[in-house]
Amino acid sequence: MEGISALEKNVAELTVMDVYDIASAVGQEFERVIDQYGCEVIGRLMPKVVRVLEILEVLVSRNHINPEMEELRLELDRLRLERMDRIEKEKKHLKELELVEDVWRGEAQDLLNQISQLQEENKQLLTNLSHKDVNLTEEEFQKHEGMSERERQVMKKLKEVVDKQRDEIRARDRELVLKNEDVEALQQQQSRLIKINHDLRHRVTVVEAQGKALIEQKVELEAYLQTKEQEAASMRIEIGKLRDKLKGEHHTNGEEIKTETLNEECIFETEKFSLDLKDSNRPRFTLQELRDVLHERNELKAKVFMLQEELAYYKSEEAEEENKLPQSLPVINSKAPIPQESGIKRLFSFFSRDKKRMPMMQKNVHFQESFGEWTNYNRDDVYTEQGQEALQHM
């Protein structure tokens, strides 16, 4: 994609730098037209082209939105959904409370009706007694006392029912608060378990990589040991052949001395290869001990690496807790940004300044040099805020 020009790219893949390349190409075309026909030909066309390129720059910069804004938008949607769920739960709880209150009011109304009915009966009995001139007997007096006692029992029962229902409502409220706390604790535990799971997966990958490295070391050591054993066997075979050859030759003493020296040299070579057991400077460990040392070293390296990972994880967790802000959502600045001059406008203003200097210079060579310097300068320094943001995400 590097060889494709900005005009041949897909519209969705355009960046602010591509817009600047298009502006540079348009400026070169304007240069050719001015060289042939003069500045008056494109005097009215140039501001319109500059405006179109500025609009294209703004649209391209809007397409490259910062991913952090997208994450904040998703977080805002999630918080809104949680808020709606909480509101629905509260509505459900209020409906339950309303049902309980309706039941309580119905029972209270029934008891009040009974009280009013008993009071009416009592009044009726009192009026009947007042109209009669008969003296109250002891039996009737006890009956009247029994009616008042019944009313007191009904009132007492009504009060107990009201207190009981009030206690039930308070208990329901406490249960709801406890359930909300349990839900929040479970959410925190879930996030903590997700972090631990991620850490464990990272450790598993590290251990697997170390296991592969140990297996490769084991294979290399076995191959090395096998080659050394083969070399030792070949050396033993050669020594045996030399001994047989020397035994078959019975010549002069000088030749015997030579054979003895050759035999001693061969024995010295074999002993030198297989490590002299009488040498005090020879290594004091076997191949299995070497493997154990290497295995222990790799285990210690793995432990050190895991401890470093744990330390980095806890440091990052502490840094996150310290950097938490009290507000849940970022406050959007209501002040409008100060409008800055567009890179396209700077490009064409620089181009127009160069064209004003052209009658005083040679037309072709000096203009090409000034335009090349302008393009390099524009690429390095003249960027709008949208262009800088696009370059950061490229």
UniProtKB/Swiss-Prot annotation:
Matches recorded under Pfam families: RH1 (PF09744), RILP (PF11461)
**Gene Ontology MF, one:** protein dimerization activity
Location within or outside the cell: Cytoplasm, Cytosol; Cytoplasm, Cytoskeleton, Microtubule organizing center, Centrosome; Cell projection, Cilium
Domain annotation RH1: ranges: 2-89
Q: What main location does UniProt list? A: cytoplasm
A single GO cellular-component term from the record reads: ciliary basal body
Q: Please give the biological process terms from Gene Ontology that the record holds.
A: cilium assembly; epithelial cell morphogenesis; nitric oxide mediated signal transduction; protein transport from ciliary membrane to plasma membrane
Concerning CDD domains, the annotation shows: RILP-like (cd14445)
Q: What this chain does, per the record?
A: Plays a role in the regulation of cell shape and polarity. Plays a role in cellular protein transport, including protein transport away from primary cilia. Neuroprotective protein.
Record-given protein name: RILP-like protein 1
Q: Which organism is it from?
A: Xenopus laevis (African clawed frog)
